[in-house]
């Protein structure tokens, strides 16, 4: 029997061990999509205890605690930090087969030097040991300990990017922290957040926005500002992919209706979103950015809890909407104008992997290797099986060797352990192919593939 999570964890063959130890393990990390707070990075935020750094904002863990029958008081409620930690320690032994079980113990090992298994019995000593380490370990220290080279946060176009600018000028921190342009509030015209957001956009643009023309000019201006601060990618939450052709004048009238507080029809919303996303796609192409589309999430399912806790608190799920036709029309509309940017496609529904991977193949070109990317296993798919399946699907239909690799997509500074988890799975998979006689044992070629997926592909793709 193998030891629990030893140095060969997940590396079930000799080739995998060689590839991981010699070529994957020590590669720097480019985390091109995450939700870390740049203010906390700049200030080297210190955490009062392991509960704050581990459980604060981590809806992955919250979902497991709820599934284990833990009262909300001990998850997001009024219980003290130690009580919340004990509730997590009570839950994690039940998580057999769940990636969070592995991530939890990788994080304990890598950041706190703790090899004990977390459970109710070990919780008091782990609490003491981890909190002792955290006295000297701030946000920057965790990042440096993780061998991170680039971090791309997720930012609203109305953000001032104050802390990105401060980090850019900070000579004592050599990790690059860049913004990512996420204009969802300006795309989702049907939501009540739209009008207040347009007002905020006007404030940072320096001019009250009263027309669609001015709105588009302001979006472009903000994209150019983001570019000057190092932004090289956008990100869009496309929960339902739509496509509906419309003229500029038609969409301008829809925009005016929305600003006047009038209710829009479903087709009007689709026309507005289509025109606005196409405009943004052209802007991204002109700037040389990558456009990330996160598709098929079903958010805020539990109305009662949404009203209490708000979004991003663990009440989302996979959607099963049809995406192929609208997505193809959208990409093709940009391609026809020679304005299709580099694009990374993620779907929360794993059934869409083959759909996305074959759509990608229709829009690859000679401008850059892997211009169209199948994004890493996202959110509910970020597991042992989910990562392996995503890589197998990509390999079956495209070039795994050109994959830009893993992202944390996380709000936790400790989540860089997931890059190790991913790299071990990558080496396991490639090692199995080699040992099954499906690819030659050519370390020159294999090392190039492994190091490309772990680091070089993303570095070249984004131009970091």
From Swiss-Prot:
Metal-binding found in the keyword field: no
EC id: 5.3.1.12
Gene3D superfamilies reported in the protein's UniProt record: Metal-dependent hydrolases, uronate isomerase, domain 2, chain A
GO biological process, one term: D-glucuronate catabolic process
InterPro entries: Metal_Hydrolase, Uronate_isomerase
SUPFAM superfamilies on file: Metallo-dependent hydrolases (SSF51556)
Entry's Gene Ontology molecular function annotations: glucuronate isomerase activity
Pathway(s) served: Carbohydrate metabolism; pentose and glucuronate interconversion
Catalysis: reaction(s): D-glucuronate = D-fructuronate; aldehydo-D-galacturonate = keto-D-tagaturonate
Keyword annotations of the record: Isomerase
EC category name: isomerase
Hydrolase is among the record's keywords: no
Family label: Belongs to the metallo-dependent hydrolases superfamily. Uronate isomerase family.
Record-linked NCBIfam families: PRK02925.1
Protein name per its UniProtKB record: Uronate isomerase
């Amino acid at each position: 029997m193998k030891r629990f999570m030893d140095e060969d964890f997940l590396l079930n063959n000799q080739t995998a061990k060689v590839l991981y130890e010699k070529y994957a393990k020590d590669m720097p990390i480019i985390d091109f999509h995450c939700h870390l707070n740049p203010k906390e990075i700049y200030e080297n935020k210190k955490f009062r205890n392991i509960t704050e750094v581990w459980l604060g904002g981590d809806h992955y863990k919250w979902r497991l605690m709820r599934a284990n029958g833990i009262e909300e008081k001990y998850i997001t409620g009024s219980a003290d930090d130690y009580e919340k930690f004990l509730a997590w320690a009570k839950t994690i032994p039940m998580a057999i087969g769940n990636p969070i079980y592995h991530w939890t113990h990788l994080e304990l090992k890598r950041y706190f030097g703790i090899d004990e298994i977390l459970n109710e019995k070990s919780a008091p000593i782990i609490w003491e040991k981890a909190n002792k380490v955290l006295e000297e370990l701030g946000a920057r220290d965790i990042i440096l300990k993780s061998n991170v080279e680039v971090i791309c946060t997720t930012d609203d176009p109305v953000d001032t990017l104050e802390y990105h600018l401060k980090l850019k000028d900070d000579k004592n921190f050599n990790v690059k922290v860049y913004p990512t342009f996420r204009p969802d509030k300006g795309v989702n015209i049907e939501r009540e957040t739209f009008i207040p957001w347009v007002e905020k956009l006007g404030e940072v643009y320096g001019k009250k926005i009263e027309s669609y023309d001015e709105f588009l000019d302001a979006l472009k201006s903000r994209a150019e500002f983001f570019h000057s601060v190092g932004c090289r990618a956008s990100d869009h939450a496309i929960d339902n992919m739509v496509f509906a052709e419309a003229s500029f004048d038609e969409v301008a009238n829809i925009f005016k209706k929305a600003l006047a507080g009038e209710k829009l029809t479903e087709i009007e919303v689709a026309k507005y979103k289509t025109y606005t996303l196409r405009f943004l796609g052209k802007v991204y192409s002109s700037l040389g950015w990558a456009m990330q589309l996160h598709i098929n999430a079903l958010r805020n399912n539990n109305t009662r809890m949404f009203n209490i806790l708000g979004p991003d608190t663990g009440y989302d799920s996979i959607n099963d909407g049809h995406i192929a036709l609208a997505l193809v029309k959208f990409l093709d509309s940009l391609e026809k104008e020679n304005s299709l940017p580099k694009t990374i496609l993620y779907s929360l529904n794993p059934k869409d992997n083959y759909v996305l991977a074959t759509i990608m193949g229709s829009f690859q070109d000679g401008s850059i290797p892997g211009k169209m990317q199948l994004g890493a296993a996202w959110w509910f798919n970020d597991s042992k099986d989910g990562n392996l399946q995503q890589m197998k699907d990509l390999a079956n239909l495209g070039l795994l060797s050109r994959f830009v690799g893993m992202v944390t997509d996380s709000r936790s500074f400790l989540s860089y352990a997931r890059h190790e988890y991913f790299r071990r799975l990558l080496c396991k998979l490639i090692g199995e192919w080699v040992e099954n006689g499906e690819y030659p044992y050519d370390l020159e070629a294999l090392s190039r593939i492994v190091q490309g997926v772990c680091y070089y592909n993303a570095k070249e793709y984004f131009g970091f």
